[in-house]
Design a protein with these regions (language model features):
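Recurrent small/Gly-Pro-centered beta-turn motifs in extracellular repeat architectures
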Residues: 76-77, 241, 383, 443-445, ...
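Short, conserved, GDST-rich strand-edge loop motifs in beta-rich repeat architectures
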Residues: 244-251, 385-396, 428, 539-545
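Small/polar beta-strand repeat architecture
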Residues: 1, 14, 91-227, 250-363
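Short beta-strand segments and strand-loop junctions that repeat across beta-rich extracellular domains
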Residues: 79-83, 193-198, 334-341, 386-413, ...
Length: 727
């Protein structure tokens, strides 16, 4: 008797073998379309000659300029890259740029290592710097010195080493009087405990003399885990490193001074490396100086550089005496960066470095995340320092700039639209996302809606749900007008109300999910296949807190089914005007997905081992043993490629017999199912039938392919069975 094998779509790992009878149990690199399983598309490198990205990318964002040219932001924990659709360019922002004292480069005979002397350099091992203007030094040529380097070791606060490609012929110093060094923002870690980043100190993590994320006068380091938020401001780009503060202890005894009857405040900061007319944030002046209150001494200040060791700013009040103070004061460059698309080869700069046309008032110097409001064209900073310049970062505060100036955050100016709100439910903001008519904001315990309401309030806030969590800042996505996210033990959706999503692979995912690495979860969509995809780290690798993304789970929101597989993608972006979704792997390369049917990370491309396996399928309700002696497969190899005419794209069709749920699975029979194809005639000829002989109460089916160029879809196969008794 011929029996149709029509299985329920989706993978179910949470039911028992018999409870899921007639369903699918396991898979890799497959999806469901119209209820039937098929192999997914492959992936190819976007640029065949790409050099691997430096660092680990955990964010992708695309936009276009006014001419329609498309750009893709690709920040890592070490660099900030942009793909301009023809090449990948490095726009990493600088934290410091200055000309050093004369002859700052020291060599040691026969060594390729050089020592750079720079007082208060703030460098850390792994940071990138660029040297220019140096002359030959003791056998190491200028061409070997004037380039980009990685700091290899830090000798002290005034010296560090880098390694050149040259070899010194003697010991000594040199380099000339115009040696310039540009310091890129500090390298972040690739791992950190979930939400244990910058913010663990008494006021958001102490900021210290070594720059972003170090404690003044201490040896501890707070984490910057390399996460970025990115958005476009018109055709330009804005971005912010998560919880990262570019702060420097001003240093010295009483470095902030006033002069009687003057409103000019002088800051003495040795080798500050700051430029004229930029805005810096002064923080930590704890008492008035010369009669000027701390609310005027602290805050965003546009500075005038007096010399390499001093700069000035003005206050509203004049001093009533000549005085000095501020021994604990810190100068901070705001961490929100801006990239002007009309200068594509220039680095991204801090908001405080924008030109005189910008007001630069009350800039936030640190934030958990930023975005640009679609409705109001305002930069919104989540979990930032408040408007009150005497207070530290508050991870429940939301601020937004004036709609006409990304640098004006002055909420006291009633002619502007800047504003501030502190949320009430939760301890810290985790992330936010733009929906059609509202912004969704997750704290550690709740979900808020943030809706434009117009002046004088700007936005209205409502709690729409509590008592759940979110795995990490990138574990959410909006598809249509529905938000989906991954928590630490469930999947959720919000379509006006919060719902825990029914999930047939919940135990499979969450019993293996490395919760301590939740900040690495990356959620995106593939609109062409109606899929929400979560890439997540499993517990099967390394210690907790250092595990990398190695698995994925998919929810098909049209078919309402789940499936999963093994693949490392640290960031992913939907098609959005492109033919393919794009992704970054932990190997540092960019890939087009749904491109061909093979693994393009190798050269030549290699096969994708795609398979799907069913749970037990009872024969004749399982009350008798039955013989299975024939299989009529129903498989199409449509769009298979790369095979020469005389080859046969094939899959392996395996039948696994079993007597009882707990009994041993029989050896089974594996038979190749092939299609003969003619490239000239486009003739498809399927294998008609397969003959086998096995006896069981139930069978499981497995379909697998491991050849290049193979595409397949399974239909409704049939088994020819014959009843054979009860034992």
């Amino acid at each position: 008797m011929l029996t149709k094998i029509q299985l329920k779509p989706g993978i179910n790992r949470d039911a028992t073998n018999y409870a899921n009878s007639g369903g699918w149990f396991d898979s890799n690199f497959i999806r469901f379309r119209n209820g039937l399983p098929e192999k997914i598309g492959g992936w190819t490198r976007i640029y065949a000659n790409q050099t691997a990205l430096i660092g680990q990318c955990r964010k992708m964002y695309d936009w276009s300029n006014l001419a329609g040219n498309q750009y893709l932001a690709i920040p890592t924990n070490v660099k900030f890259y942009v793909d301009d659709s023809s090449s990948i360019i490095d726009i990493s922002p600088l934290r410091r740029n200055l000309t050093l004292a004369s002859n700052p480069i020291a060599t040691s005979n026969t060594s390729s290592t050089i020592t750079i002397t720079d007082v208060n350099h703030g460098g850390t091992v792994g940071d990138y710097i660029t040297i220019s203007g140096a002359t030959n030094v003791n056998g190491i040529t200028a061409a070997q010195i004037n380039k980009e380097f990685v700091i290899q070791s830090v000798i002290n606060t005034s010296a560090y080493t880098v390694t050149t490609t040259g070899t010194a012929t003697s010991t000594g110093s040199g380099g000339g009087s115009v040696v310039n060094v540009s310091y890129q923002f500090h390298k972040g870690t690739t791992s950190a405990s979930a939400f244990s980043g910058w913010g663990s100190g008494p006021w958001g993590g102490s900021i210290g003399q070594y720059g972003w994320g170090y404690g003044p006068g201490t040896t501890f380091t707070t984490f910057y885990n390399g996460l970025w938020s990115v958005d476009n401001y018109g055709e330009d780009m804005v971005a912010c490193p998560r919880d990262l503060t570019n702060g420097t202890l001003i240093g010295g005894v009483n470095p902030v001074s006033t002069s009687n009857t003057s409103n000019v405040v002088t800051v003495t900061q040795v080798n500050h490396g700051l430029a004229n007319n930029i805005a810096v944030v002064i923080y930590g002046v704890e008492s008035p100086i010369g009669g000027i209150p701390i609310t005027q001494l602290n805050g965003t200040k546009i500075i005038s550089v007096a010399n390499a060791n001093a700069y000035t700013y003005t206050t509203a009040n004049v001093a009533t005496s000549t005085a000095s103070g501020g021994s604990s004061a810190i100068s901070i460059q705001p961490s929100i960066i801006y990239w002007d698309i009309t200068d594509p080869n220039g680095p991204a700069v801090s908001l405080g470095e924008l030109g005189a046309a910008y007001e630069k008032k009350y800039l936030p110097y640190v934030a958990v995340e930023i975005m640009v409001s679609d409705q109001n064209r305002q930069i919104i900073a989540f979990g930032c320092n408040p408007y009150d310049v005497t207070k530290p970062q508050d991870k429940m505060v939301i601020r937004w700039c004036d709609s006409s100036d990304p640098t004006n955050w002055d909420i006291a100016d009633t002619t502007k639209t800047a504003g501030e709100q502190r949320l009430s439910s939760g301890s810290y903001i985790v992330t936010a996302v733009q929906n059609r008519e509202e912004i969704l904001v997750w704290t550690d315990t709740s979900l808020f809606t943030m809706t434009p309401v117009g002046p004088p309030y700007g936005y209205g806030f409502n709690v729409v749900g509590s008592n759940f969590d979110i795995a990490g800042p990138n574990s959410k996505v909006v598809a249509g007008s529905i938000a989906y996210w991954m928590g630490t033990n469930n999947f959720y959706m919000y379509d006006g109300k919060i719902t825990a999503m029914p999930c047939t692979v919940r135990d499979y995912v969450f019993l293996d999910f490395s919760v301590d690495d939740g900040e690495k979860v990356y959620c995106s969509s593939d609109s062409g296949n109606n899929e929400i995809i979560w890439f997540y780290p499993s517990q099967s690798q390394g210690p907790a807190g250092s595990r990398e993304v190695d698995k994925y789970v998919v929810y098909n929101y049209i078919e309402e089914v789940w499936y999963y597989g093994n693949l490392s993608r640290t960031a992913w972006i939907d098609r959005r005007g492109h033919s393919n979704p794009r992704a970054v792997s932990d190997d540092g390369y960019l890939y087009n997905h749904e491109s061909g049917y093979d693994d393009g990370s190798t050269s030549p491309a290699s096969a994708i081992n795609a398979y799907i396996e069913s749970s037990a399928i009872e024969i004749e309700n399982g009350d008798h043993f039955s013989f299975v002696d024939r299989v009529i497969p129903d498989i199409t190899f449509r769009n298979s490629t790369t095979h020469p005419i005389d080859a046969q794209p094939s899959v392996t069709f395996t039948i696994k017999p079993q007597d009882y749920p707990g009994s041993q699975i029989g050896a089974g029979n594996a038979r190749p199912v092939t299609r003969n194809s003619s490239a000239t005639l486009n003739v498809n000829r399927f294998t008609n039938q397969l003959f086998t002989r096995l006896r069981a109460r139930s069978v499981a089916l497995r379909l697998e392919s491991n050849e290049t160029g193979v595409s397949w879809r399974l239909g409704i196969p049939r088994l020819d069975t014959r009843k054979d008794g009860r034992r």
